[in-house]
């Protein structure tokens, strides 16, 4: 993980071997066979460059500093996990395409970079890749023990309790552990002092996120008098910056299609069915993952670790086979997603996400307190 902040290096060895083969006149046919794979690989690596915006590069540097120099950890599970970020982006992208007048009954006229279907495939591919790559290449050594703890079965609720919670939160596209619904007096009079302190700190941070500007993603739960309820539904929804829809006092869009969600799309070019389809789309089914299995990393980790993936992504994609057309479309969608992260980086990359190892350990031992 020492190279997380650095882009993968060019395969210089392959280039040297190719040069030596060309100079070997006694084995010209063999040299030709060896040169072409190296040449293709070097061309693929050049094509796989995924430029990371400067503001996100600074976030990577900050991440490295907090973990390695200040010995801090990201508090887990994150309030805004990778699945939530990807789902928010797909809705943001879909609404943007709809606002520009692209109708899905005529997909042949839409450019690949404006294809909602390709955007969804990209998001799902990132989720799957993140789940596989995180324990292998996305963790610093200091984070390994935390990973083993948060992915253990003891970190999450028993199956019976999770099943009952799932019935109360059918909307949620990720199975974040939902606490019982306490009364306000019970929430205030909880016995754990550290839990109260974190709840108060979260309540003081919330206005800073929601008042930054009127056109960005918000968590759906806005009841600041009940921090526990706010944590139990960490949903993001798009308030588009380049659309004619504006609200003096932004309110969250309901996940299920309804009057509230449709009202937020007033002025969009599109049918009610199109708008409802955007609002109701989910990255994964409600019953994923099964209740007897711990959630995957994309349900636990957040923007900090997702951004690390983009440092390793060129190397990962370089080992896959893509046609030139598909690769070009994929890279375009990845670039658009990075722009989205850069635009809302102040909301996704919070300094308060980094806590001392002791506090991170406490959070891991008390999964009811979602970050």
UniProtKB/Swiss-Prot annotation:
It comes from Mus musculus (Mouse). Its main location: nucleus. InterPro entries: MRG, MRG_C_sf, MRG_dom. Residues 206-216 have a biased composition (Basic residues). It is found in: Nucleus. It comes from the Eukaryota. Keywords: Chromatin regulator, Nucleus, Transcription, Transcription regulation. It holds the Pfam family MRG. The gene is Msl3b. This is MSL complex subunit 3B. Residues 8-47 have a biased composition (Basic and acidic residues). Residues 1-47, 160-230 are annotated as: Disordered. Residues 183-193 have a biased composition (Low complexity). One of its GO terms (cellular component) is nucleus. Residues 44-367 form the MRG domain.
